[in-house]
Amino acid sequence: MKLQAVMETLQRQQRARLQQELEARQLQQDSSEGRTPPSVGYPGNGSEEAEPEALKIQRAQAAALAAMRAAAAGLSQQPSPAASDEEEEDGESMASDEEDEKERDGESERYPDMGSEEEDLKGKWDEDDFEDEGEEDDYEDMEEGMGVSEAGRVGKGSTLPPKHPNPQAFPTQRSVGAERAGLPHTGHPQLQDHGDWTYEEQFKQLYELDGDPKRKEFLDDLFSFMQKRGTPVNRIPIMAKQVLDLYMLYVLVTEKGGLVEVINKKLWREITKGLNLPTSITSAAFTLRTQYMKYLYPYECEKRGLSNPNELQAAIDSNRREGRRQSFGGSLFTYSPSGAPSMLSSPKLQVSALSLGGVATNGSSLSSMQKIKKEEDSPISLTVPPRIPVSLAGHSMVAAQVAAQAAALEQLREKLESGEPPEKKMALGTEEQQRLQRAIQHNLLAMTAQLPMNIRINSQAEGRQDSAVNLTTNGTNSISMSVELNGIVYTGVLFAQPPTSASGTSKGSSNRTGSIGGGSSTSQAAPPPAPSAPTSNNPSP
């Protein structure tokens, strides 16, 4: 902005000085015309003098352009007396040229306003040249925008009369700018051609992967078929940083019986080796299947008819279900505490079933779903019959309980997989379920000394308020229990009983004190006494 302001000031000073000199010359011209006849205004050879006048105008414009460029180049320095003298000399030369133009205007009355128009045109040329200088300085810094700036300069020059005697100035500037930038004149079409070349090169590589004469015939037929089908092949798939050989993929799959057979028999490893692809590629089977379905399966159905889309979908669904069965639960229960028995270290678990002893409160059973949570808040949901819901915290409790379940269920699974009659399998299943319940109860009681346990049970019976059960361990063989029902809190202690019989129970008694609406009671119970109302039973089936 400062540079532009200085330029405008300089232009105004030069114009004022030129105007003064022109007025002085005009007075002298008027005095000389008073002594000579006015026949000069209509010369017989006017056409011959018109051409030199046009050349004078062009020279004047060129001189003005040179003066403006010199002024723009010296703006960063302080104006010196010598520079001012040069500017005055340039101004005088421009004044003489302007005087010639004025004389021509005086001789021809058809163009009375030519002088003012010439000054306006010169002002416009000066401003445009100043902008051109700024753009030329940025040539090397604006390589990509070179074409746009050049087009803008040509557009400006086309709106005004030619100011240079050499009309090839702009093409020369463009060529120089192109050499500086190191880019051709048509940069964007060059990029587009490069993209087309890459696209064609991929097809060329696909055609030239080997010398099989059937390759070209197959690829031509495939591409024409996909084009007619409305799904043209717009790009060649890339796998392992190389072009995927669609021809060999089609040959290998059809030799195996088609895509459905390859999926059902899991033959993708052989096809991967046949394509000379690295065996270390992750999900190579999925990638090959999806690429085959996209580019080759419609062609297979049309030409060979080895399968149909319904069979393909069924094969994919079956493969997905098998994958889920194989990966279910195998790695979820591998954690085993150091102090756990060796029978609890089996990592296999394929059937989830867990039932714990229920707590009967005034004849009403509390039932819900059970969720076991680790400290990382990763839930493991286990299917539970209508029994007590338990929420445990801690790695040891979770691992021990799940490991005990896994050990019992592993034995159950091995027996069920042995070819025994269904009736015997059902009987064994019931027996193993009972054994599992007893093992879980035993392990829960054995672990109370290692890990504090807080069990809260919520249930809502019909016509009753929420009930809650809190269990807290006090030692190795006792559990403090607190039950809140209809606003009344019942507390007691449950003692462990050796599992000598299947129907053995752990009994505790509590004395009820308090009032309805939030009363609390505290009781001390001993193992032998008979239970009193309310009772808390933990039967094992």
Swiss-Prot record:
Residues 407-501 form the REKLES domain. Residues 84-102, 115-144 have a biased composition (Acidic residues). It is found in: Nucleus; Cytoplasm. GO terms for biological process: regulation of transcription by RNA polymerase II. Keywords: Cytoplasm, Developmental protein, DNA-binding, Nucleus, Transcription, Transcription regulation. Residues 452-473 are annotated as: Homodimerization. The keyword Membrane does not apply. Transcription factor required for smad1 and smad2-mediated responses to TGFbeta during mesoderm induction. This is AT-rich interactive domain-containing protein 3A. It comes from Xenopus tropicalis. The gene is arid3a.
